[in-house]
Amino acid sequence: KNLMRIISLVAKTHREIGQYLNTPILTFWPFQVNQSYMSRLESDGSPHMSKLADLKRQLELLQDATGQVDLVIGHNDLLAANILDDGDQLWLIDWEYGGFNTPLFDLAGLAGNNGLSILQEQQMLEQYFDRSWDIYWRPYQAMKCISLMRETLWSMVSEIYSEIEFDYGAYTSENLSRLSSAILEFQQI
């Protein structure tokens, strides 16, 4: 029930928020964001240097698999903590990553960050696009990998710089595992 409400909110936001904005909007292009994180990790001597060459190779393959995209104004950080329910309506909060992106990135982030099942992902795509899920499955799965890669790289950078008391090393390991699983699933499509 809540998932359907969340998907409706995301779709409505993507389709309608632009009419309320009257200033230029930046693009949050996850391929460039990931490349930027990797460059920073390299220049700052990350303990994860040995993983970066493989991540760069995967990034290229996933960008090719994503293909041409439509742009919407996306939230780009759909963690459960960024979706509030006041009992009457849902709210998307924490828009620091907001900007133009493919809707597949928000949908992939929603699924990847919240542990949706394959059936839930397929239903999500059908509800959002009002078309059969299989049309979007391959580019969606590629974007799911990209979303998980972004979260992983962000965590790696946070290991170096964050002053927040949080086990970023464990969070990086968790996300690397989720990313590896997602890439294996993607390769089977």
Language model features: what each stretch is:
Residues 1-24:
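Conserved kinase catalytic-core helix
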